């Protein structure tokens, strides 16, 4: 099979990369009704599979789970989760032939095997759904022409999809229809109903394309969302310890620092995160972030280039064929790093202390978010898509590190994200070592003293922070979410 994106001509590539439209709430007036009375069969019962299924059932849809015979016979975790939550469970042969919509929510590396197994069983005119388009775009999976292919991609982990639904809201979601597979022209109606059934329409839905979702998703997770956090954790910990900081304190400052810092990012973007610093610290964080952007820009661009060309995907799929040798080696090496094996600090670190003593970490977040966003936009991805795949998801990933360090992050994210994370972090750590050697007192582990600042310089820095394109689009999208949550709660 050929990489689907690479079969398109340049005009088609640019059109699909640039497809992104924020959909109005009125476009979801019919809710999930288009799928009511139809049979929806989910393949896979992991975090997305289970939690999307719970939401869809609560929205009035007929949901069941198709699992492999071995998973049922051996009563594996997927079988237990589905049955314990009261769902009908059966084999592919038992459930797929009756399905109007088959939703493939298995890991990326299983998609080809799953699709080859279920496609011959699907009835004429059925629909096939994904929550990530890797199999269609990068693998180039060929789907029968009578089958409609759609995507609903919540921009949050599965647990968050469920919790927000239970609160009467939802999570921002991308939806798309594969242009090669919409024989009856009903793809958008199916995708909208599925998104509404998960609650996504209450938080904001972007009409996108399989191509735009895949290319932006890969870029975000490899760079700022996972790769930058991993590289930053390892570099900052080693720097602190080398300068005499207690390893336990250093570990806690970093492990929980990312979450604390990005919570401000979540509420008010880079502007609010930077506003949590004193004026001297803000000026220093800005200067550091500009240095970091200059150093890391070629690395970010290389990742984007390799994603666009398909070089990244072909390399990762070669590792799949080699029993994940690279992935497993990198995972083992990460587990042995000094940061991962450091003792726990039993003392308390106050919220403001994370900001005051984490100026470098804030600079890394700012630089990484802006670089990821800028690089995606320069490659033809629309700003709204770039925002969701950079700034929006960062607090969610930072939260996984707060739970069990890098181990937890790499367990929670997909194998695709984990592989890309290692590619980036293994290149980024040595790239930034000379920069780390030139840091000043107050950049990390101690606070920058209060002092006079130049008013004109502070004004210009504040203007530069607030006028960045990601701050403009972020303010708009966060406003949509706030307004929609207010409407949802009131309703």
From Swiss-Prot:
One cellular component term from this protein's GO annotations in UniProt: cytosol
KARI N-terminal Rossmann domain boundaries: 15-208
Entry-linked InterPro entries: 6-PGluconate_DH-like_C_sf, 6PGD_dom2, KARI, KARI_C, KARI_N, NAD(P)-bd_dom_sf
Gene3D superfamilies in UniProt: N-(1-d-carboxylethyl)-l-norvaline Dehydrogenase, domain 2 (1.10.1040.10), NAD(P)-binding Rossmann-like Domain (3.40.50.720)
Pathway annotation: Amino-acid biosynthesis; L-isoleucine biosynthesis; L-isoleucine from 2-oxobutanoate: step 2/4; Amino-acid biosynthesis; L-valine biosynthesis; L-valine from pyruvate: step 2/4
Free-text function comment from the UniProt entry: Involved in the biosynthesis of branched-chain amino acids (BCAA). Catalyzes an alkyl-migration followed by a ketol-acid reduction of (S)-2-acetolactate (S2AL) to yield (R)-2,3-dihydroxy-isovalerate. In the isomerase reaction, S2AL is rearranged via a Mg-dependent methyl migration to produce 3-hydroxy-3-methyl-2-ketobutyrate (HMKB). In the reductase reaction, this 2-ketoacid undergoes a metal-dependent reduction by NADPH to yield (R)-2,3-dihydroxy-isovalerate.
The entry's keywords: Amino-acid biosynthesis, Branched-chain amino acid biosynthesis, Magnesium, Metal-binding, NADP, Oxidoreductase, Repeat
Source superkingdom: Bacteria
Descriptive protein name: Ketol-acid reductoisomerase (NADP(+))
Native source species: Salmonella typhi
UniProt-listed Pfam families: KARI_C, KARI_N
One GO BP: isoleucine biosynthetic process
């Amino acid at each position: 099979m050929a990489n689907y994106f690479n079969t398109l001509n340049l005009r088609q590539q640019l059109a699909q990369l640039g497809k992104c439209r924020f959909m109005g709430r009125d476009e979801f007036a019919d809710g999930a009704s288009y799928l009511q009375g139809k049979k929806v069969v989910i393949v896979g019962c992991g975090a997305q599979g289970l939690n999307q299924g719970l939401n869809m059932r609560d929205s009035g849809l007929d949901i069941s789970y198709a699992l492999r015979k071995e998973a049922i016979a051996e009563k594996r975790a997927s079988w237990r989760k589905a049955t314990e939550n009261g769902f009908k469970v059966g084999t592919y042969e038992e459930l797929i032939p009756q399905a109007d919509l088959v939703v493939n929510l298995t890991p990326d590396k299983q998609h080809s095997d799953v699709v080859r197994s279920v496609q011959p069983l699907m009835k004429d005119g059925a629909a096939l759904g994904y929550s990530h388009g890797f199999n269609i775009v990068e693998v180039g999976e060929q789907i029968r022409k009578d089958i409609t292919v759609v995507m609903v991609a919540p921009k949050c982990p599965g647990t968050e999809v469920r919790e927000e639904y239970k609160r009467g809201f939802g999570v921002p979601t991308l939806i798309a229809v594969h242009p090669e597979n919409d024989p009856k022209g009903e793809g958008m109606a199916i995708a909208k109903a599925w998104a509404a059934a998960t609650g996504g329409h209450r938080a904001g839905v972007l009409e996108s394309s399989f191509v735009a979702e895949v290319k932006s998703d890969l870029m975000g997770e490899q760079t700022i969302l996972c790769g930058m956090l991993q590289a930053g954790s390892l570099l900052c910990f080693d720097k602190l310890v080398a300068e005499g900081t207690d390893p336990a304190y250093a570990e806690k400052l970093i492990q929980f620092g990312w979450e604390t810092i990005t919570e401000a990012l979540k509420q008010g973007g880079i502007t609010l995160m930077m506003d949590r610093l004193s004026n001297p610290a803000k000026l220093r964080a800005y200067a550091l972030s500009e240095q970091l952007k200059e150093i890391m820009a070629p690395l970010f661009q290389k990742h984007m280039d390799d994603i666009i060309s398909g070089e990244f995907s072909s390399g990762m799929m070669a590792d799949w064929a080699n029993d994940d040798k690279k992935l497993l080696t990198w995972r083992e090496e990460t587990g042995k790093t000094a940061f991962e094996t450091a003792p726990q600090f039993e003392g308390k670190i106050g919220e403001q202390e994370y900001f005051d003593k984490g100026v470098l970490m804030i600079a890394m977040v700012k630089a990484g978010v802006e670089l990821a966003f800028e690089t995606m936009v320069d490659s033809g991805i629309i700003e709204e898509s770039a925002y969701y795949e950079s700034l929006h998801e960062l607090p969610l990933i930072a939260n996984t590190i707060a739970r069990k360090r890098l181990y937890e992050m790499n367990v929670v994210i997909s194998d695709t994200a984990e592989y890309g994370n290692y590619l980036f972090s293994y290149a980024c750590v040595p790239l930034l070592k000379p920069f780390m050697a030139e840091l000043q007192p107050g950049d990390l582990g101690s606070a920058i003293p209060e002092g006079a600042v130049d008013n004109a310089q502070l004004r210009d820095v504040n203007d530069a922070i607030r006028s960045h394109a990601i701050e403009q689009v972020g303010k708009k999208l966060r406003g949509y979410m706030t307004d929609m949550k207010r409407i949802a709660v009131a309703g």
